[in-house]
């Protein structure tokens, strides 16, 4: 590790195979916490390269616990986190909204590392028991149209660095990696990123894959469509900037999207959205993220139709019923 750190301190970049080997060594416990923290710190001080990102991703996917749910052609809706905004669990709520609209979803998530509550925290608040058993995950897809994959069960390297990430409490390159390493390798993905350079990096990375994708970024720094500002959506060969008003939404204030101070607070907000008692801003931000996920699956549909499908799922109670069935089956 000493030689690797010297190389990085001298502003050199890692090759793809080199990055892959480093992540494998982290997962195998070959480096101590101080060495891993030093490595992470390097990537806080400069942008990660495409070769480095792909190498780290290669390692995680090679070491993953594989799960084959390809017959469902599922979508994952996931953000990098690390935007410092402490929003409620928008992407998780959007997942249940999309599932309620009839589209299969495989949500890959984790505990919050830089925020109060990650997707796994919300699931635990509902009594969900995590599993890596393919038959149980397949049954969840068949019965509820959604399955949840708790990242540490499927990616040993993510489990190994979890205490270090929590202690650092700032975004790291593992934030960038999380959305890229869903062990199912879903057919579709809606990915949220916290800055424009990462949007371009993700777009470039996904152009080499078979996954149909869209990458979103709100221009005021959110790693999802926040409706607080204009936002960019990038797909293979296309980028477009939208305003909330152009889609029929009022702009939100940042305070309206706050996730609270505890996992219990975040779970209450999540439940209010699912039950239809949340504020207009909270519901709208879930609807718009769900709509763009539906658009990834059905690119022929106008975005207005996708918004209508997402709204109907949330406001009719289909999303709530999907959550209820999911909790009953997986509790």
Curated annotation (Swiss-Prot):
UniProt-annotated binding residues for anthranilate 2: 165
Pathway: Amino-acid biosynthesis; L-tryptophan biosynthesis; L-tryptophan from chorismate: step 2/5
Keyword line: Amino-acid biosynthesis, Aromatic amino acid biosynthesis, Glycosyltransferase, Magnesium, Metal-binding, Transferase, Tryptophan biosynthesis
Binding sites annotated in the UniProt record for anthranilate 1: 79, 110
Catalytic activity: N-(5-phospho-beta-D-ribosyl)anthranilate + diphosphate = 5-phospho-alpha-D-ribose 1-diphosphate + anthranilate
Residues binding 5-phospho-alpha-D-ribose 1-diphosphate, per UniProt: 79, 82-83, 87, 89-92, 107-115, 119
MF terms in GO: anthranilate phosphoribosyltransferase activity; magnesium ion binding
Listed cofactors: Mg(2+)
Pfam families per record: Glycos_trans_3N, Glycos_transf_3
Binding-site positions, Mg(2+) 2: 223-224
Gene3D superfamilies: Nucleoside phosphorylase/phosphoribosyltransferase catalytic domain (3.40.1030.10), Transferase, Pyrimidine Nucleoside Phosphorylase, Chain C (1.20.970.10)
One example of a Gene Ontology biological process annotation: L-tryptophan biosynthetic process
Textual note on the cofactor: Binds 2 magnesium ions per monomer.
Enzyme Commission number, as recorded: 2.4.2.18
A GO CC term attached to the entry: cytosol
HAMAP family: TrpD (MF_00211)
Homology family: Belongs to the anthranilate phosphoribosyltransferase family.
Function: Catalyzes the transfer of the phosphoribosyl group of 5-phosphorylribose-1-pyrophosphate (PRPP) to anthranilate to yield N-(5'-phosphoribosyl)-anthranilate (PRA).
Protein name: Anthranilate phosphoribosyltransferase
Source species: Bacteroides fragilis (strain YCH46)
Organism lineage string: Bacteria, Pseudomonadati, Bacteroidota, Bacteroidia, Bacteroidales
Gene: trpD
């Amino acid at each position: 590790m000493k030689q690797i750190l010297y190389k990085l301190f001298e502003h050199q970049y890692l090759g793809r195979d080199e990055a892959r080997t480093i992540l494998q060594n982290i997962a195998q416990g070959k480096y101590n916490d101080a060495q891993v923290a030093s490595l992470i710190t390097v990537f806080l001080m400069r942008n990660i390269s495409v070769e480095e990102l792909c190498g780290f991703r290669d390692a995680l996917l090679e070491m993953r616990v594989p799960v084959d749910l390809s017959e469902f052609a599922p979508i994952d809706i996931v953000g990098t986190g690390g935007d410092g905004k402490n929003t409620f669990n928008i992407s998780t709520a959007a997942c249940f909204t999309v599932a309620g609209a009839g589209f299969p979803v495989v949500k890959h998530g984790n505990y919050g590392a830089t925020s109060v509550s990650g997707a796994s925290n919300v699931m635990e608040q509902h009594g969900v028991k995590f599993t890596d058993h393919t038959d149980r995950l397949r049954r969840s897809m068949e019965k509820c149209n959604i399955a949840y994959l708790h990242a540490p069960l499927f990616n040993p390297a993510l489990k190994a660095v979890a205490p270090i990430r929590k202690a650092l409490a700032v975004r790291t390159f593992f934030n960038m990696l999380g959305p890229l390493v869903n062990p199912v390798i879903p057919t579709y993905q809606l990915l949220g990123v916290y800055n424009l350079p990462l949007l371009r990096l993700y777009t470039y990375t996904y152009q080499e894959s078979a996954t149909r994708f869209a990458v979103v970024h709100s221009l005021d720094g959110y790693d999802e469509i926040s409706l607080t500002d204009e936002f960019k959506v990038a797909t293979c060969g296309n980028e477009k900037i939208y305003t909330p008003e152009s889609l029929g939404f009022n702009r939100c204030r940042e305070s309206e999207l706050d996730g609270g101070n505890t996992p219990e607070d975040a779970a209450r907000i999540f439940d209010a959205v699912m039950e239809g008692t949340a504020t207009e801003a909270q519901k709208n931000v879930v609807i718009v993220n769900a709509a763009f996920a539906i658009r990834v699956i059905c690119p022929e549909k106008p975005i207005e139709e996708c918004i209508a499908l997402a709204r109907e799922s949330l406001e009719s109670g289909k999303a709530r019923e999907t959550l209820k069935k999911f909790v009953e089956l997986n509790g």
